[in-house]
Each structure stands twice: as C-alpha cells, then as structure tokens.
Amino acid sequence: DVGKKAVANDIEGSKKLWGALVYAVKDAASKRDGYEDADAEMAKALQQVFKDYKHFQVLGTRAEALFKTTHSWVAPSKQLCVKFDFAGLTEDGIGVKLDLQLWNQGKAIVKTDAILKPGSPVFMEGPEWGNGLLLYVLKLQDGKDDKEPLD
C-alpha cells in the first residue's frame, strides 16, 4: 500500500520495537544461573499478567527499527523470536499497528494483531521451558532511547 509506505518513510528510524525473552518460574530454586533478574518494573508488570509466576529472568534483549522493510524480526534467541509487519499508525498518530508472529524453532506458534503505544508493552506467552515458561515482552521505543524499562 503506497500510503503505508509513505508514512513509514516519513518516520523511519524514529521508533524501535524493543523485545525481551524472559524466563518465568514459580520458585527461586528454578531460576537459571548466569541470567539477570528482570528489573522491578518489568517483574511487577509480568506478575500482574502471569499470576502463577513469581520470578522473571531476562535471557536476551534486542531492539529493531520499525518500517525498514516489509517485515522485521526481534530475535534475542535463535529458537524463539518475533516477526512483525507494520500495519499502519493509530488514528492518534502516537502508536503503531503491528501484525505479530511468535516463532519457536522455525514455526509460527502465535499470530496476533497488536497496537503498541509508548508505556503499553505487549506480553506474549511462549512454550514451557525447563521448570518454567518463556515469555516475550515487546514495547515501542523512541529511536534515540536505548533504555529497556517499560516506561
């Protein structure tokens, strides 16, 4: 769509999609060595959605510029990653509409449409792993902002 491409070109590089692969477990004994705990803000937000889980570790993060191709990947892991396609701006121009796919070992396991706005992350539930669950956190990030919190 020509209109979509024009809008994308106008704001190319001004926004990024930031993603984190998170390991969620119910007890501290199940945590993995060598990984950082999610910061308090992220852990609190995740615990509100995934109520059975008490501990969250960040396994990897990645930020990818929006609008640079017809589709892009946010891939902190070779096995679990998110493919996203730009589907336009929200009516207020603040957020973006995305077609999201969560991929596990080369297969799409979740497909959804999402609207991302600053301060409103999206959480995607992935497969069970070890004694816990893999989660994917996505947030819209200003292109100049390299911070990772959920603000």
Regions found by a protein language model. Name each.
Residues 1-151:
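Outer membrane pore-forming secretion/assembly proteins and partners of Gram-negative envelopes
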